[in-house]
A protein has these predicted regions:
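N-terminal flexible segment immediately upstream of the FAD-binding catalytic core
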Residues: 1-61, 77-108, 258-268, 315-342, ...
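N-terminal accessory segments
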Residues: 1-36, 66-68, 298-318, 411-416, ...
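C-terminal substrate-recognition/cap domain of FAD-linked oxidoreductases
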Residues: 22-32, 217-218, 224, 229-232, ...
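Short, ordered loop/turn segments at secondary-structure junctions
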Residues: 74-77, 137, 255-258, 421
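Short beta-alpha connecting loops at secondary-structure transitions
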Residues: 98, 105-108, 226, 390-393, ...
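FAD-binding subdomain of flavoenzyme oxidoreductases
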Residues: 99-254
Length: 434
């Protein structure tokens, strides 16, 4: 086997001196991510910062010739060890490739490099009245390249779908350094194999995306947001399922369980009831109140206590800000406990009440704090077990409970990961799922 520490060939690739580093601190930073627990990865021998497709191609070709492993790296915000090397080699940090190359309003398209932070896309589109809808909650800190690699999704997936539905074309560098163009800028095509979608969600295992053409859509003329309070978690999940199966045109529908509500109140100084809630947002070109009323009527049949629609945009923005930071708030909730990496199972809508009920039954049976919330409109739930970090047995049992939730989701016809990806954290579930 080749020596993964022999990266002397980098000096012959024409890279600038600041485009690669063997600094111990830099290498250590690229041996971890935001969520990996007890990482079994190996720090890369070198970190390379390409600034163009040509740089990526040169590095991959040379690494391939020398049998040196390369692990693509974006913002490092993944939760499952996706960008962490397992055999050392080179960490290919694409964050310097962060340009918006073109905005074509007439085509409803934008061309971007992979290192661009997601929220910067929508900021640039403001003046055109357009937006890119399928952003994850981490859009302010994660890159579009990482989102494409994970086939990311977020709160608006229930209406707008996942990233792969909005990627029109990709420029990809393969392991041998060859550059391929996949997809097209046409709205539709029946030409040949859909290789573009094979790359989306492949987590950097098949190639490195160096340019993406994304589809856009006009910003909705009408937006209404609010919250609904229910008599029980089961009532809330049943109401969500009923609304979705009835075809309610909702852009966001988020479950917040009582523990998550309590954490939100303490962290953000809000006065939300410590009760099961659903956060909602509707997008429409016209007649938005009709859809709000339809949703309210369905909720009324499923244990609705109160449904309040925000009168001012700032009021709802405050709730969405709290929801976006809820995972971090959970981590700060108890000084004596720490959270395990958040899970993100997704199940068919008809089983949503079942999986949330199962999570709550585990919490009750084992006297555990297991907050549960998530993008309920597409069957997704986020959860974590709070454990005593100083008690190895407690940590191990917490991980066992996390695994049980995944096993149950798979039994229900769901997936181990709705949006965080496989990485190293969920590899053991691949065989059972596929």
């Amino acid at each position: 086997m080749a020596d993964a520490t022999d990266i002397t060939f980098l000096a012959d690739l024409g890279l600038a001196s600041d485009q690669y580093s063997v600094d111990e601190t830099v290498r250590a930073e690229h041996a971890t991510d935001w969520g990996t627990d007890d990482a079994d990865g190996v720090a890369p021998t070198a970190v390379v910062y390409p600034e163009s497709t040509a740089d990526v191609a040169a590095v991959l070709e040379a690494a391939n010739d020398h049998a040196i492993p390369v692990t693509p790296y974006a913002a490092g915000t993944s939760l499952e060890g996706n960008p962490i090397p397992t055999r050392g080699g080179i960490s290919l940090d694409c964050t310097r490739m962060d340009a918006i190359e073109a905005i074509r309003p007439a085509d409803l398209q934008i061309d971007v490099e992979p290192g661009l932070i997601g929220s910067e896309i929508n900021a640039a589109l403001e003046e055109y009245g357009l937006f890119f809808p399928p952003m994850p909650q981490s859009a302010d800190i994660s890159t579009i390249g990482g989102m494409i690699a994970n086939d990311a999704s977020g709160a608006k997936t229930v209406k707008y779908g996942e990233i792969h539905e909005w990627v029109r074309a990709l420029e990809v560098v393969l392991a041998d350094g060859s550059v391929v163009e996949l997809g097209s800028k046409a709205k539709k095509s029946s030409s040949g194999y859909n290789l573009k979608d094979l790359i989306v969600g492949s987590e950097g295992t098949l190639g490195v995306v160096t340019r993406a053409t994304l589809e856009l859509t006009p910003k909705p003329a009408q937006i209404r947001g609010g919250r609904a309070v229910f008599e029980s978690v089961t009532a809330a999940t049943d109401a969500i399922s009923a609304a979705i199966t009835a075809g309610i045109d909702v852009a966001t529908i988020e479950l917040i369980d009582p523990l998550s509500a309590r954490i939100t109140n303490e962290e953000f100084d809000l006065d939300l009831p410590d009760a099961p809630m659903v956060f909602l947002e509707f997008h429409a070109a016209h007649s938005i109140e009709t859809e709000v009323d339809r949703c309210r009527a369905i909720f009324d049949d499923h244990g609705l206590l109160r449904m309040d629609m925000a009168s001012e945009p700032a009021e709802m923005e405050r709730l969405w800000e709290a929801r976006s930071d809820l995972a971090n708030a959970v981590g700060r909730y108890r000084e004596d406990l720490r959270m395990l990496t958040f899970g993100d199972v997704t199940v068919p809508m008809g089983e949503y009440s079942t999986i949330v009920g199962y999570i709550r039954s585990l919490a009750a049976e084992h006297d555990r704090l297991i907050p549960a919330f998530g993008h309920a409109g597409d069957g997704n739930v986020h959860y974590t077990v709070l454990v005593d970090p100083d008690d190895p047995d407690d940590v191990a049992f917490g991980k066992e409970l996390m695994d049980r939730i995944i096993d149950r989701a798979l039994e229900l016809g769901g997936t181990a990961t709705g949006e965080h990806g496989i990485g190293r954290g969920k590899r053991e579930f691949m065989t059972a799922e596929h």
